[in-house]
Amino acid sequence: MKPGKSITIMLIIVSTVFISRATVNRKEYQEPLNVFIANSSINALIRKETSEAQNYVITYTSEDQKIKTERKESQQGGDSTSIEKRGTPEPSIAKPITSNPELGAEIAYIRGVNDRFPSYKRGATKRWPIASITKLMTALIAEEYIPKETKIVFTEHSIETEGTAGSFVVGDVFLKEDVISAMLVTSSNDAAVALARNLGKEKFMQFMNEKATTLGLRNTTFADASGLSYLNQSTAEDLFIFMKYLHLIHPEILEITRLKEVKIKELETGTVHEISNINALVTRSDYVGGKTGYTDEARQNLLSLFRDRDSNYTIVIILGSANRFDETVRLYNWHENR
């Protein structure tokens, strides 16, 4: 065989192998990933195909286990909204950090909903009292276990709870949805306790902690529905998973949290309560929703979801802060401009 002919054959073989490998790699890259969650404890990338987001909940498992789904019985009815229709994009990799933001919070965490890793984290696995952020789980359990048209009665026990937000009195009767709105918008402790007592406090707490386990929130515990107890604790990594779950599966809860004000009607007297949101970020057009929290032990907490002009969603977590709103905005701006 002539030398020139031998070189030509070798080039053809090498080119064929290269094209074949490139084709395989391209197929692997383009394989759809409809939902992914990085479990806080094991950093496992979870894959799940679903077309009925409202009718299924996600069970998070380790990498060597198969993904499980469990059928959720809806108390509300109505059409479900598929995750696929919302168009979850391929996960992106966070850009390299150029400099750290100046923050005084005990715990700070920011991560794009579809990013594999946070762009900034401080104390991400440290357990911390989350205060009224607890009410997001209270709302979730109330939506899943209390029928939509249920009338919630405010008892003396409910009204005796610390705090007066919502201006409720003993004997008030409201529809469940209105009580949830008051709880999320003005952070009413009375409303949270009234919801829990509808099912019974022990059963309600059981449902809250079972839901945390189901979602893979391994470092999260709940002791009451209001968040007043120091034992309502979580981590930034767990809160990221929880907020992402609400965003994908229960966006209606976050929609309530960004309302500037709500009007709810007492059913016995017809009295209308006008309630304003205590979250300063609801005036921002890019704010999707979230929840404030404060106790003396926890200091100022804030869990937030933002959406930029390209419809990219970002979760920001600030715990143990002296100025939660300022530090949340500072961290989000740093993330967007780095």
Model features per residue range: what roles?
Residues 7-21:
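Hydrophobic membrane-insertion alpha-helices, especially the h-region
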Residues 115-116, 129-153, 239:
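Active-site SXXK
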Residues 144-157, 250-258:
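Short, well-structured active-site flanking segments
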Residues 114-124:
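Short, conserved catalytic-motif segment at the N-terminal edge
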Residues 2-7, 23-107, 200-338:
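Penicillin-recognizing serine hydrolase domain
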Residues 153-165, 229-230:
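Acidic helix-start/capping segments at beta-turn-to-alpha-helix junctions
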Residues 101-105, 124-127, 132-133:
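Extracytoplasmic Gram-positive cell-surface binding/anchoring modules and repeats
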Residues 161-197, 273-289:
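Conserved catalytic neighborhood of penicillin-recognizing serine enzymes
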